[in-house]
């Protein structure tokens, strides 16, 4: 069934909030009326270029190394059809619905700017897929992030043509039947249209946007869980003093320190050891959270800035312009997704570091020499009970896995198309791997949440702060106190899902009002 959420799409005006809406749930998209004038004018330019009887790449020539091959006018439609079917060579699991919706919405936003030469019926066809929640089957693997995301976008286009398979409400069916069920007509491509549909960075950008959304949620949740760990370990709040962080001046550091001050304020546990505590300084994993998590917040913001520009960009090739002497098709390289690859690699660093520091706090909480008087491995009768001993090993394993995954994908390149396309971005993989990294980090932070919550419960007779009590209560709604050894894997999964839900962030949202600079 069509969604009741609506999105009025104005070219070059997409926001991160709108993109999050598209990722999270089906939408009804409409295109601003002003766009159709530019769309029609651009298509008229293509018709004029064809009428000149001169070669124009991608319009009446072959592709890649075959660009010098001239195609006769009566085969221009076949040229575009053959382009799509020959380039539909993806492999692997299909992309999830939210990612595919992002791809289609950003492709509409690009084509609707009137520099790609397609007819309005092509754009309306994509809007029809979006509005009937028809999800093309797009395999996850097969793009190197230049020349555009050719293979995955070809699979998207197959559905528009009534070929291949797609999904409605999670059920796989033929694209032909899905279009008929929705009352939509398959599109027959005209000159330039196939290339316009598949040349672009929308897949890489959608995958990286998914990683960006996950990173935003994780940096927020890791902050509240990290504050819970500080209190559980009887740590100090003095390292969060505003004067320290103002002297350095980094936005993220200042904001995370402010959050820690507010999250811990009023804790009876903190008040219980303000005096007669011979510990001079806490370990870095407690004390340096503003410096580390704040730096993660800053680079998440940098990535968001890049992705917002890219989501509103025209990344087709060639592009259609009108000069004083008439229309021209200019070949360039906007399809090269290097900015997206850099954004993805930046997000990978943030996601890995959030998990890495969280793992260190788990290690601290189970270590009786560091945890402020908590029992070894956070359990009564240690020895008979192993407590959180091996839960920490899981956190360590995932943190180390993320360190390998965080290696920058953008430094890799491999030539393709007989060396015509001799430098590529690897942005598609760079963005895709962020999901697995985020799942790992969510599990690590979930284990820390279990450990910190356990530590809070051992401070009998003392309450943590009001804000942290709310976070602790959310945990205890899902997972009970660990009084003796039990099957722990389901508890870890429950805590992970609580982290991914971002529910722990809802009760202190006003403290994050200035965190994300693109909002």
From Swiss-Prot:
5-imidazolinone (Ala-Gly) crosslink site(s): 146-148
Protein's cellular compartments: Cytoplasm
2,3-didehydroalanine (Ser) found at: 147
EC number: 4.3.1.3
Keyword match Lyase: yes
Keyword Cytoplasm: yes
Post-translational modification: Contains an active site 4-methylidene-imidazol-5-one (MIO), which is formed autocatalytically by cyclization and dehydration of residues Ala-Ser-Gly.
Any one GO molecular function term: histidine ammonia-lyase activity
PROSITE patterns reported for this sequence: PAL_HISTIDASE
Keywords per UniProt: Cytoplasm, Histidine metabolism, Lyase
Top EC class, one word: lyase
Coiled-coil segments on the chain, per record: none
One of the GO BP terms on file: L-histidine catabolic process to glutamate and formate
Annotated Gene3D superfamilies: Fumarase/aspartase (Central domain), Fumarase/aspartase (N-terminal domain)
Catalytic reactions on record: L-histidine = trans-urocanate + NH4(+)
Family: Belongs to the PAL/histidase family.
Gene Ontology cellular component annotations, sorted alphabetically: cytoplasm
NCBIfam families: hutH, PRK09367.1
Domain of life: Bacteria
Name of the protein this chain belongs to: Histidine ammonia-lyase
The protein's annotated pathway: Amino-acid degradation; L-histidine degradation into L-glutamate; N-formimidoyl-L-glutamate from L-histidine: step 1/3
HAMAP family: His_ammonia_lyase
